[in-house]
Amino acid sequence: MEERKQETTNQAHVLFDRFVQATTCKGTLRAFQELCDHLELKPKDYRSFYHKLKSKLNYWKAKALWAKLDKRGSHKDYKKGKACTNTKCLIIGAGPCGLRTAIDLSLLGAKVVVIEKRDAFSRNNVLHLWPFTIHDLRGLGAKKFYGKFCAGAIDHISIRQLQLILLKVALILGIEIHVNVEFQGLVQPPEDQENERIGWRALVHPKTHPVSEYEFEVIIGGDGRRNTLEGFRRKEFRGKLAIAITANFINRNTTAEAKVEEISGVAFIFNQKFFQELREATGIDLENIVYYKDDTHYFVMTAKKQSLLDKGVILHDYTDTELLLSRENVDQEALLNYAREAADFSTQQQLPSLDFAINHYGQPDVAMFDFTCMYASENAALVREQNGHQLLVALVGDSLLEPFWPMGTGIARGFLAAMDSAWMVRSWSLGTSPLEVLAERESIYRLLPQTTPENVSKNFSQYSIDPVTRYPNININFLRPSQVRHLYDSGETKDIHLEMENMVNPRTTPKLTRNESVARSSKLLGWCQRQTEGYSGVNVTDLTMSWKSGLALCAIIHRYRPDLIDFDSLDEQNVEKNNQLAFDIAEKELGISPIMTGKEMASVGEPDKLSMVMYLTQFYEMFKDSLSSSDTLDLNAEEKAVLIASTKSPISFLSKLGQTISRKRSPKDKKEKDSDGAGKRRKTSQSEEEEPPRSYKGERPTLVSTLTDRRMDAAVGNQNKVKYMATQLLAKFEENAPAQSTGVRRQGSIKKEFPQNLGGSDTCYFCQKRVYVMERLSAEGKFFHRSCFKCEYCATTLRLSAYAYDIEDGKFYCKPHYCYRLSGYAQRKRPAVAPLSGKEVKGALQDGPTADANGLASVAASSAERSPGTSMNGLEEPSIAKRLRGTPERIELENYRRSVRQVEELEEVPEETQAEHNLSSVLDKGTEEDVASSSSESEMEEEEEEDDEDDHLPTSDLGGVPWKEAVRIHALLKGRSEEELEASKNFEPEEEEEEEEYEEEDEEYEEEEEEESSEAGNKRLQQIITAADPLAIQADVHWTHIREREAEERMLPTSESSTSRAPLDEDDLEEDADSEPAETEGEAAEDGDPGDTGAELDDQHWSDDIPSDAEAEHRLQSQAKVKAELELRVSENEEEKPSDAPKQEERGTSQVSSPSQPPEKQVGVFSPARSPGTEEAKSPLATKVKSPEEPLFPTPLLLREKPKAEVPEEQKAVLSPIRSQPVALPEARSPTSPTSLQPESLLAPPTPPTPPPTQLPICSQPQPSSDASIPSPTKSPIRFQPVPAKTSTPLTPLPVKSQGDPKDRLSGPLAVEEVLKRSDLVEEFWMKSAEIRRSLGLTPVDRSKGSEPSLPSPASKPISLKSYSVDKSPQDEGLCLLKPPSVPKRLGLPKSAGDQPPLLTPKSPSDKELRSSQEERRDLSSSSGLGLHDSSSNMKTLGSQSFNTSDSTMLTPPSSPPPPPPPNEEPATLRRKPHQTFERREASIIPPPTPASFMRPPREPAQPPREEVRKSFVESVDEIPFADDVEDTYDDKTEDSSLQEKFFTPPSCWSRSEKLQAKENGRLPPLEQDVPPQKRGLPLVSAEAKELAEERMRAREKSVKSQALRDAMAKQLSRMQAMEMVSSRSHTAQSQGKELGSESTRHPSLRGTQEPTLKHEATSEEILSPPSDSGGPDGSVTSSEGSSGKSKKRSSLFSPRRNKKEKKTKGEARPPEKPSPGLPEDVVAKPKSLWKSVFSGYKKDKKKKSDEKSCSSTPSSGATVDSGQRRASPMVRAELQLRRQLSFSEDSDLSSDDILERSSQKSKREPRTYTEEELSAKLTRRVQKAARRQAKQEELKRLHRAQIIQRQLEQVEEKQRQLEERGVAVEKALRGEAGMGKKDDPKLMQEWFKLVQEKNAMVRYESELMIFARELELEDRQSRLQQELRERMAVEDHLKTEGELSEEKKILNEMLEVVEQRDSLVALLEEQRLREKEEDKDLEAAMLCKGFSLDWS
């Protein structure tokens, strides 16, 4: 019996697993049926099915799923499944929205039946998911069914996978799902209800299907069609001709593919360069492109019609889009080639093979469809009543609201509508009256089209079917039941829609309220008469002749702006001059475009009445609510200024803003409107179409329109302010404008001369045809049709607010092509476009579009306007039938089906076949993954995520090589035996598991998300930013620029290349970075901090990802050894091969530094990342590197260039660090380089010789030389031994170097010089930054610490820059260049008393100076984003080293001499597992000297009380979460931390390992030798730097002294904090600190541990400083503060918006600094800065508090760490672990208890608890992930905003076209040109006025949008510049050429300019927003106004 029972149970488990893992629709249904049969369950019993299934399937894998579903189902809104118990619902379509609706209805207790027409889920297309949708799906157990669901940064999923997930959930809940059933209509209840009480049924095919017998009370259409259910009228949005092409390529999930970054599209919106290159290279002309990596490689692009014609994709050009895109008119082969070519180019040919996936017809999965017209249903639901039966009919998904692709709006709004519909059904079932149900549903539906990820509620955990939980300002009673009566169809209402329009849209043109409208010309005339009263020579009696002299116009302007016109000086006789003056001033100052020229006005007998009405209306609208000058005589100057500002138009502001090429002009009204618009634009962000909607879509109620009008008027005032700002900015822009701008004259001045070749204002300048008043635009004195206003080069339709004009040849260009005007390119390029122009001239609609790829439709529309009706109707009518049938993609699909069946007679291929073909690579792995996911949520998800990381994230991990493989390669390169590899591999898995478990589901989710995200999202970002490797991601700029970058890299062998790369990326980066400066940094750091993160990720992935620390250690050890060797060789080679190294370094640096850190720092960061990844990357490199000269260089080059994609992280990391370091000191550095690279490297750095060389480049040549002698010995031993301890750290140190390396590699001296130069540049940058900050009202970041010292340092000495590393310890001076060496010194110090004193010595001014320079550097690197990543790796390294050190240190009294390292235990051993051993060893080795240097890194963390540790963690956590903060963090923290950590970590770790090594290798002396260099290094620091550092330290002391010092002195418990402080505080601390800092970031305690000793020794700032290194502590502190200040400043520079955050970050950073008066302060500050930076934006206050707390506690901790705490190390470690987990738990679902439990379990499983290093690494990793995720979110937000703006601009264009069309018709009638004779019909005149007003509103709205777009563009540019600058500044100034330095200055200046522009824009928008807020008391009305009618995207 028992056995049989067991078999049954096992079988059930197998069947359940099969069901969960099913990959097709049919397979899922079959598996589910088998499961039910086996368990003897009947799904038809829907009420109890789920509960029975749950009770019968007692399977641990299922329990996690039950838990999630129970949690969801227990929500109060579902009333325990009894809310809709007797309601029967039919859902049409098993798409994502239909299934999602079914799930909610089922949870409500309803009987739900879903019918699906097909039986296969075949759509590979990828959907972008908004954050709430991810949260929602996770809550339904998505990860249980699809382990890779949104892992890491991935936030998209294929439609197929989403359907499978929801299908499985639906089946489990007992929902009936029928496939192969097609809905054909409703069957009304029979009239004879007495005999048969039959209700509503469905008519289906096949007719005999049981579903046809069901009766329903609710039917929901979710099949994506437009006409499945009757009664829903559609609103159409017609944009420009938009042709989309989607393509799916097979994803084989190879490493190479994993490295290719995704493209999210944001960069392309503003980055025209890529599209230009694409067109030049391939002839493909796109408007946009997006690439998502999912089960397939999914590309979606918007192609321009002309390029499709040119490439032969479309055979014939038809006006009708249906004909145009019909299968007969499309060459399929050409289409495939077109898609493949575009995909290949956009990914830089990095996808190895682009084989098409197949669709369900077995054909290549490529589709082309038209989404010019998108539809939205006018209502979401209706009720039908027939024969006593009511039927509630509703729509969800695309049927309700078609999405504008590809922003993820479809699924997001679809899910929202699904929940809204469920809420409606709930109300219906609970007995609410039908009209009330409908009124509530429509009130909610009003908001749906306006939802964006930003304006929905942010508390996703509270989401339920109740709309109040999802829409922030919802008024569910907005509509009254009486207003929706038309939606209740009792079968009697004849004209539902007429009634509906009257009810819902009482006014079709809400904007024109009676009092606002100038409907009667008498009103306008009366206003003009009042304004011109009392002016001599002005007598206004009409709207024509009275204005001829021009005096009346001048009088109106003078009345309001007497400052603009000297009325008394005007001569009444000079008609032309007077009019031209008025026109010019109105255009320039008020944003009102002229309707004619002064010359024309003088030459005509009587001015045209219609033109004058049009023109004067704009003055009326602008000034009607303003005070005239006579009324303002009593106002003070300030009030007058405000008044003046209020009469300035945003448009004019916009036209000046950054219009260095040419002035942008806005339509006459546009500027005015802009004024309104600007204010609205703020709102626009949410629904950017506010105004226009009002004007065109008469959807809003009257109230809304009036409110809107009021708002508009108010906005006008704001506009003026904008204009005022614009004028001020304009002067500056013009000063800075490029020479070319001379050709571009101000519009005003140009207009003054009436072009002789013009026929007048009624003749189009371009096509020479008649241009009517309503369609007339003017720019530069020319008048033309909107559709004729095109770029001479590319024929893109131009906007008045964005164009460039070449005065000499009278041609207009889009800004990107202005530079081509003289190149002959224009002529060459124009041909392709030429037809367009010609066609435009013809005025054919199709031509317009053709010419306009961007605004095809609009052009067409414009032309159509000319011949009203025809074109438009022509376009619309042919496609109407089809359009009503289905959505664009559906139409495409149906076309395909038809053509396929006719031509090839193909049947649909089975879903299995399709899946097998498309997903072969996925399916092989899939089962395991799925199984894993089902296993245990936390474990599974973590595992999967980790797996994903391995597979997909390899990029982040090892640059695309799975870590295991990387390890193997690494080992092989190192000469590791296969067995060892196997051993390490075995080790790693354990660790991975542990980590996974430890992280838990949520954490894991985060990690997964972050890592994968970092892979995917990061890739996307990278793509946008750079094609670089994940490591390079940081630096990555747009992928568009990647190529450039690579080329530049090639050209610039040294850091220059990296810099150059950055610039290339700059544009894209700007976009990305700008919009997400923090993101980019954060992402880079997290994701792409290749140096930091990459290093760390490698490290972490290696170590962290490596589940167990031991494993990681082991791996690290072997890797480190190999790496060390490689690195050494590489270093040597690097010097020899500067160009190669620079490239690679650049890449690595770029990646690393790209975020915030300077290259050096990044290098440091990189190293750590490299150590694992590097080792792997290095393996190839290593081999080559082995031959120091040739191999390394050539390989790096190859690797670097190609591997960018292939070996981005690792190789880049490896090469970068290696090269960098070797450059400075070939010999010394070589060793160091390897050391740095490898964990051992870090350890090795302890050997003074090696580190010094490495550091030397950073610090100064002298150091290298001194160290040089030691390098070789240190090299190998250190390399090998330190590897383990240093794995993380070494990477970090190396990265530091590597960043500085490009030039370093080339030559030590050069490097030094460059470093100096760099520091000068940095200083200049900081100063400017401070200025900007001040101008912004922000407190300038305190740069004195980092920046100033840095400057002096560099100035005084190259070493200065490196001084931070030098700071670490006297010995480390040589090591200085290598941050890690510093650490060794510190360790060394413990080894030898001499060392220790040097540590203290740093106190000395020179020390401080060193520190300052170090700080500066650190700042840079931190800012690069090293901080986060570095922190991770450093933390890890520190954790292993420091923790190990802590343990040993703790074990051994500080005073006792360090015991010799166990002979068998090498640094490598120490590495991860070795951490513990290492710690002991370190302790023994370093103890006496260590007390200050060692103890504090390792032990402090251990000893500090948990609380303290936690605090630190909390701090870290706080800092972790936010991308914005991340940016700051990268800026602040990363810089500080990174450098510091680099230096910091290595010192402690190295000390021990070094000592061990030294002892083992007889290297102790070298360490001591190092010490002297360190001392020397300290002196190297300039006095200025020292002073600055000291000042900083003092300031910090003051702020934190009491707390931090007291704490530090009072308790060693604060050790943790001390650790944090230490990491910031000393360079050794820096190297350590980097690790520690990272750790501290992650595990403040970790940091504290390392720092404690130092702190203890130097309770006072100075004392602490010396202990850390020469100037290490001080330097650390200083540098950390300085860097954080710097980074803050930088961020402020970069992103004005960040200013506040930065301020906070600054403040926060400072408090931390304060906590550790000396090093501790710095250390604390540093970690804090990093963390805070990360979190500052989001949790500024919290951060501050936590920072201060942790700071204060940390210092005390540090002080106490000395003796007792060392022992505490293990405890501390555990606590750190916990804390880290806890801190992460904030981010994750894990609770602290869970974390504790987990950690305890882990420790049980693995006796060895996570070392502090590991913990910190993990923490760092999480932080990085959080930052990455945040950055990604920022990027996505920017993308979303850009796409919304783009779409709205298209909408505005279309509306304008329609208005112009009507206006032309009315004008013709009024002029008698319509064949009816001249009519003075008052009705026509009234109509004319209305149209004029609407057009003005449109223009104003368009200008608003343009301002938003401009602001977004500036944000983006700033972000890219910021990124590039970071990359460049990461390289030591002494490594840079004059050209590079001047380039940096240029970038800085440009950035300042961008910041100023953005600040003015932001200020303007903010002011308008505030004004609007005051005027808008009714929020609901505001929502309405926001474009419910306009924006259906």
Curated annotation (Swiss-Prot):
Gene3D superfamilies associated with the record: Calponin-like domain (1.10.418.10), Cysteine Rich Protein (2.10.110.10), FAD/NAD(P)-binding domain (3.50.50.60)
Cofactor dependence: FAD
Residues that coordinate or bind Zn(2+) 1: 764, 767, 785, 788
Bilayer-spanning residue ranges: none
Residue stretches making up the bMERB domain: 1832-1981
Biased composition (Basic residues): 1686-1704, 1819-1830
One of the protein's GO biological processes: cytoskeleton organization
Ranges of Polar residues composition bias in the record: 860-873, 1230-1239, 1257-1275, 1434-1452, 1623-1633, 1754-1763
Modified residues (Phosphothreonine): 887, 1274, 1339, 1452
UniProt-annotated location(s): Cytoplasm; Cytoplasm, Cell cortex; Cytoplasm, Cytoskeleton; Nucleus
Stretch list, region Disordered: 658-704, 854-886, 905-1023, 1039-1309, 1332-1546, 1559-1837
Cystine pairs: none
Catalytic activity: L-methionyl-[F-actin] + NADPH + O2 + H(+) = L-methionyl-(R)-S-oxide-[F-actin] + NADP(+) + H2O
A Pfam family that the UniProt record links to this protein: CH
Keyword presence, Zinc: yes
Family: Belongs to the Mical family.
UniProt-recorded name of the protein: [F-actin]-monooxygenase MICAL3
Organism of this sequence: Mus musculus
